UniProtKB/Swiss-Prot annotation:
Organism: Streptomyces galilaeus
Molecular function terms from GO: hexosyltransferase activity; UDP-glycosyltransferase activity
Any Pfam family matching the protein: EryCIII-like_C
Annotated function: Involved in the biosynthesis of the trisaccharide moiety characteristic of the antitumor drug aclacinomycins. In the first reaction, AknK catalyzes the transfer of 2-deoxy-beta-L-fucose from the activated donor dTDP-2-deoxy-beta-L-fucose to the mono-glycosylated aclacinomycin T (rhodosaminyl aklavinone), forming the di-glycosylated aclacinomycin S (L-2-deoxyfucosyl-L-rhodosaminyl aklavinone).
Name of the encoding gene: aknK
NCBIfam families: glycosyl_450act
Biological processes, Gene Ontology terms: antibiotic biosynthetic process
Cited InterPro entries: EryCIII-like_C, EryCIII-like_N, Glycosyl_450act, Glycosyltransferase_28, UDP_glucos_trans
Protein name from the UniProt record: Aclacinomycin-T 2-deoxy-L-fucose transferase
Catalytic activity: dTDP-2-deoxy-beta-L-fucose + aclacinomycin T = aclacinomycin S + dTDP + H(+)
Length: 440
């Protein structure tokens, strides 16, 4: 069968798709990945075939403008909450109709439409009409995928990159909407998708918002309990092209700690919520070897202690198995890779998307710790947390338990037959096509 993956131009989101894309390709299926032109080179470096759609997204420039306009981190978080972009809310008393309506109003206008502009959707639909994929697998923020599937009749699945905030919030939204009078049931996401689909002569169904099914790489015990049908998937780390440095082949002389704030975070968000100076200061006095994946900009004006080795990039999939602990910002790639290798984690959450929820889950399962007051912590706080991870055996034991759970979850290769079956069940008549209004 033909399988089309779609994502907006964020390298970390595309990397989350690569293991499954390759599993399908090595099973004999034709695979393409569609994204904006600024991701094309990164896609082709994976050995997969890229399809350029829309104009360059220039995500880094967009985020820099947003950050410059909002100010410091506290102001950014406060502004996002006031704008209704807090999809992370879980407290029942806070999940009112006004809150969830505000979430979908702001997220649709500021996130979904910006990551998936009209031109991109047009191009994905045009390619899908021509190529006729049987299955479209889409990043949870890339609605061009389900729109193209609805227009062409392809089956479609949402592939998560972290916890299913969208699915959970959408269920809450629909439950609260049912309690409203018909004339008070605003639905910004549905309205946008209905208008978009109408341009191609297609109609909205709720599955366009959340997928016909979801492929979920989060360990089963850590998933949000959503009603959406899902296919469990073992997370397989993919770090892109890399050469393993010679020093990494040698066993560490002391307990090794990885300090990373994420490549995607520094490339896109142009800054770090955590103070790198405070992080390094906290580690300087400990009898450990630190490998810090920090670039020249992050290290500017800083004198590194003797026990800290700074490297611009090293694949975490090769580094973390040699580590006794990892300190990071809560990004999905680092979080999942550490779980896959059974490494205790200290999270300094950057408060983006699901990082605070992952931190809480990790601490609840006894597999790590996080800084509860991320804006007010000291070097001693960091040292105390890290020493607990290194000295208390329960953290490594609980990490090993989660790792066993992940190993027991079906791999990308294992789920290919199920995806073939689901595609056959959900794919519609290939004549189910529309045209953009005004086209002849």
């Amino acid at each position: 069968m033909k399988v089309l993956f779609t994502t907006f131009a964020a390298k970390s989101h595309m990397h989350a798709q690569v293991p499954l894309a390759w599993a399908l390709q090595t099973a004999g299926h034709e695979v393409r990945i569609a994204s904006q032109p600024d991701l094309a080179e990164d896609i082709t470096r994976t050995g997969l075939t890229a399809v350029c759609v829309g104009e360059p997204l220039l995500l880094e420039e967009q985020m820099q403008r947003v950050n410059e306009g909002l100010g410091d981190d506290a102001e950014i978080m406060e502004s996002q909450a006031e704008a209704g972009m807090d999809m992370t809310e879980t407290r029942p008393e806070m999940l009112t109709w006004d809150h969830v309506l505000g979430v979908f109003t702001s997220m649709t206008a500021m996130a979904f439409q910006n990551s998936c502009p009209e031109r991109m959707i047009d191009d994905v639909v045009a390619f899908a009409r021509e190529w006729q994929p049987d299955l479209i697998v889409w990043d949870t923020l890339s609605f061009a995928g389900p729109v193209a599937a609805q227009v062409t009749g392809a089956a479609h699945a949402r592939l998560l990159f972290g916890l299913d905030l969208l699915g959970r919030m959408r269920e809450t939204f629909l439950d609260l909407q049912e309690e409203r009078l018909p004339e008070q049931r605003d639905d910004p996401l549905r309205e946008w998708l209905t208008w978009t689909l109408g341009r191609y002569g297609a109609e909205f169904e709720e599955e366009v918002a959340v997928g016909q099914w979801t492929v979920d790489p989060v360990p089963p015990s850590m998933r949000f309990p959503v009603k959406q049908p899902f296919v469990p998937l073992r997370y397989i780390p993919y770090n892109g092209q890399a050469v393993i440095p010679d020093w990494l082949h040698e066993p560490p002389k002391k307990r090794r700690v990885c300090l990373t704030l994420g490549v995607a975070h520094r490339e896109v968000l142009d800054g770090d919520r955590a103070s790198i100076g405070e992080l390094v200061e906290a580690l300087a006095e400990l009898d450990v070897e630190v490998v810090a994946t920090l670039n020249e900009k992050q290290l500017a004006g800083m004198e590194l202690p003797d026990n800290v080795r700074a490297v611009d990039f090293v694949p975490l999939n090769a580094l973390l198995p040699t580590c006794s602990a990892v300190i990071h910002h809560g990004g999905s790639g680092t979080f999942q890779t550490a779980l896959a290798h059974g490494v205790p984690q200290l999270i300094v959450p950057d408060m983006v998307w699901d990082t605070i929820h992952k931190a809480k889950q990790l601490e609840r399962f006894g597999a790590g710790l996080y800084l509860h007051d991320v804006d007010n912590y000291t070097a001693q706080d960091l040292r105390d947390h890290l020493l607990r991870l290194l000295e208390e055996p329960s953290f490594a034991e609980n990490c090993a338990r989660i790792r066993r759970e992940m190993v027991g979850t079906p791999s990308p290769n294992d789920i290919v037959p199920l995806l073939e079956k689901l595609t056959a069940e959900h794919r519609r008549d290939r004549g189910a096509r529309g045209t953009v209004r005004g086209e002849q």
